[in-house]
């Protein structure tokens, strides 16, 4: 049984916990502790009730400083300094670092010094970590000596499996990406101050361009794609699910049917459970709570002049990513034990 702790219990932290119980991986992973500065009553309430993902079916209770989920007891901590967390006493194997604020190796090593054996960051990180993993593509690079690993981003997990498939079958010369991302909690409900002037504006009233490092994230997973991609991102007034508009120029000449067939076969084969394919006339809310990293919308595939291909990809940017956190942590333990 892998003993884990969650540091930072926001959207991703709570999704990880709920996904653990819904995915059937509870027999392999035990959440021992949650470190979150919010009040325990709010922690328990937001675990039980969620606007996006609905009510959590197991009954959740607060007893003293512990959250009870069925027979499971989870210690609630409120320690702002990771170096002071009791990971050694709790025998923590992996910390899910989900604050969004601790993103480099030096900061994450505070968890290691506190006694945790490994750290998995729920965010793109600095280049000094032991590895950045997109599960399904490069988890085989994990080694026993790796202690600090990044799970990349939800959009990197969405797009990299598709690029990998296209490149292996047709060769990818270059690409351009537009991420159409749901609003996030770094935006404002009504106009208010923010360092990014666009994010001073009300999230529910505008389509808001934001910076993205997605193209650089692709390069980290697929180094041979260096300088081949550029990306922009906009936030839209929805609370969950992201669409990615991917345009790629291929080495080979293709048609719509060929591209869709290759992607559907990959979804049913090597990337089963990671990549999906649909030809139904669906909209974003239909992918809410979908555990896959990426779903190709075959109805929107377009080909121009035989080599310019445009695809529409969907992902639940919370739930899919949370499930990959679980998968990657299991792969980290497997590598450590090999």
Swiss-Prot record:
| Tagged with keyword Cytoplasm | yes
Q: What is its EC number?
A: 1.2.1.72
Q: Which reaction does it catalyse?
A: D-erythrose 4-phosphate + NAD(+) + H2O = 4-phospho-D-erythronate + NADH + 2 H(+)
This protein's UniProt keywords: Cytoplasm, NAD, Oxidoreductase, Pyridoxine biosynthesis
Among the GO biological process terms of this entry, one is:
pyridoxal phosphate biosynthetic process
Entry's localization field: Cytoplasm
Which residues are listed for NAD(+) binding in this entry?
11-12, 317
- List residue numbers at the site (Activates thiol group during catalysis): 181
Source organism superkingdom: Bacteria
Q: In which pathway does it act?
A: Cofactor biosynthesis; pyridoxine 5'-phosphate biosynthesis; pyridoxine 5'-phosphate from D-erythrose 4-phosphate: step 1/5
KW Oxidoreductase (keyword) present: yes
Q: What is its main location?
A: cytoplasm
Give the residues the record marks as binding substrate. Answer: 153-155, 199, 212-213, 235
A single GO cellular-component term from the record reads: cytoplasm
Stored InterPro entries: E4P_DH_bac, GlycerAld/Erythrose_P_DH, GlycerAld_3-P_DH_AS, GlycerAld_3-P_DH_cat, GlycerAld_3-P_DH_NAD(P)-bd, NAD(P)-bd_dom_sf
Identify which residues the record assigns to the active site: 154
Q: Which residues form a coiled coil?
A: none
> Could you tell me one molecular function GO term of this UniProt entry?
erythrose-4-phosphate dehydrogenase activity
| Pfam entry (one) | Gp_dh_N
- State how it assembles: Homotetramer.
Q: What biological function has been recorded for the protein in this entry?
A: Catalyzes the NAD-dependent conversion of D-erythrose 4-phosphate to 4-phosphoerythronate.
UniProt similarity note: Belongs to the glyceraldehyde-3-phosphate dehydrogenase family. Epd subfamily.
Question: What is the name of this protein?
Answer: D-erythrose-4-phosphate dehydrogenase
């Amino acid at each position: 049984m892998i003993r884990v702790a969650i540091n930072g219990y926001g959207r991703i932290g709570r999704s990880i916990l709920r996904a653990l119980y819904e995915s059937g991986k509870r027999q392999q992973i035990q959440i021992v502790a949650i470190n979150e500065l919010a009040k325990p009553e709010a922690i328990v309430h937001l675990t039980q009730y969620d606007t996006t993902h609905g009510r959590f079916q197991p009954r959740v209770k607060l007893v003293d400083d512990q959250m009870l989920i069925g027979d499971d007891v989870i210690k609630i901590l409120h320690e702002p300094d990771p170096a002071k967390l009791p990971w050694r006493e709790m025998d923590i194997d992996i910390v899910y670092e989900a604050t969004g604020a601790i993103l480099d190796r030096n900061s994450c090593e505070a968890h290691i010094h506190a006694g945790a054996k490994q750290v998995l960051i729920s965010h793109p990180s600095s280049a000094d970590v032991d590895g950045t993993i997109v599960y399904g593509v490069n988890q085989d690079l994990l080694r026993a000596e790796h202690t600090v690993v990044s799970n990349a981003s939800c959009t990197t997990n969405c797009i990299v499996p598709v690029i990998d498939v296209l490149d292996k079958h047709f060769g990818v010369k270059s690409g351009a990406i537009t991420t159409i991302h749901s609003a996030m909690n770094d935006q404002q409900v009504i106009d208010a101050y923010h360092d990014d002037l666009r994010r001073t504006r009300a999230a529910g009233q505008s389509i808001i361009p934001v910076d993205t490092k997605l193209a650089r994230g692709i390069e980290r997973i697929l180094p041979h794609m260096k300088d081949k991609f550029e990306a922009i991102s906009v936030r839209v007034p929805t609370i969950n699910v992201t669409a990615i508009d991917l345009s790629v120029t291929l080495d080979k000449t293709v048609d719509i049917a060929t591209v869709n067939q290759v992607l559907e076969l990959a979804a049913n084969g090597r990337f089963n459970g990671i990549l999906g394919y649909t030809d139904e006339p669906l909209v974003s809310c239909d992918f809410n709570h979908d555990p896959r990293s990426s779903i190709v919308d075959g109805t929107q595939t377009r080909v121009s002049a035989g080599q310019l291909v445009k695809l529409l990809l969907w992902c639940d940017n919370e739930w899919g990513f949370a499930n990959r956190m679980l998968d990657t942590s299991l792969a980290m333990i497997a590598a450590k034990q090999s």
